[in-house]
Structures are given as structure tokens and as C-alpha cells.
């Protein structure tokens, strides 16, 4: 974040791996502290908290600590924290969840959590449609920032 001192928008997504070993209350408390630190360093930036993404049904079955119901509980707590602290909340999970609330299997053929280039485009398109001045964000901006998915700020 310090690489972009004039950031106008900062997008944060944490949690996919941590929910397996960090309790919800501790997770949300530490997430809030992290966001507050960002706000102190970038008081004029809009800060967007992104929901934790769902996992595939096969990941959920093989690793129950990553249950999508648990992810939904963490996301509800993140939404409440974001509202209390006046941060924007983006329910990115809605762009990835299938009719059962799972990440489609083809989205993450390797580990059931992390997806490939096609789904980074889905993420990028979601962000463009759900932030202010989304027409000012382009794929060229993402490439310029060194990201294959979307601009970090």
C-alpha cells in the first residue's frame, strides 16, 4: 500500500485460508485493525472490503473447516464490521457462487479455493460494476499496476 501513496481506492480481501484456523471474532477484530491502519495511512482513499469467496463442493467435503456456511458467517461478520467502521463492502462471492453457494468446480481445478485466469476476469468485471467511477478502471490499469486481475488501488 505504501507503494501507492496517492491511492484513491483500496481493495482488501483476506480470509480464505485463515478461516480454517482463526476464530470469527478474532478474524474480524484483526481485519478491522488492519483496515484502520490503512485508513490512517490513506485518509482520503475509499476502502473496499471484499467478501471471502466460496470454495468448491469437493473442497468443502474434503476439508470441512472450509465449509461455505462458515464462509457465509464470516462474510456476515465482515459486513457488520464494514458498516460499523464506514468501509465499503463488496459481496464478490455473489459473482462466483453457483446455485448451491459453491465455487464451480471448473473455476478451481487445483485446490478448490483459488481460481484461474478466466475467473480473474469475472472478479475484475464485478469490481468495475460495483465501485464508483468504474469506467475509469481498465485492464490496462491492472497491467500497469502489475496485477493480472484488477488494480490494487
Tell what function each PLM region has:
Residues 1-3, 32-41:
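Short amphipathic alpha-helices and their capping/turn segments at secondary-structure boundaries
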Residues 1-28, 52-58:
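Oxyanion-hole/transition-state-stabilizing segment in secreted/luminal serine hydrolases
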Residues 54-150:
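Catalytic His-Asp segment of secreted/periplasmic serine-dependent ester chemistry enzymes
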Residues 13, 37-41, 81:
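Short hydrophobic alpha-helical module
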Residues 24-34, 68-74:
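Charged helix-capping and loop-helix junction motifs
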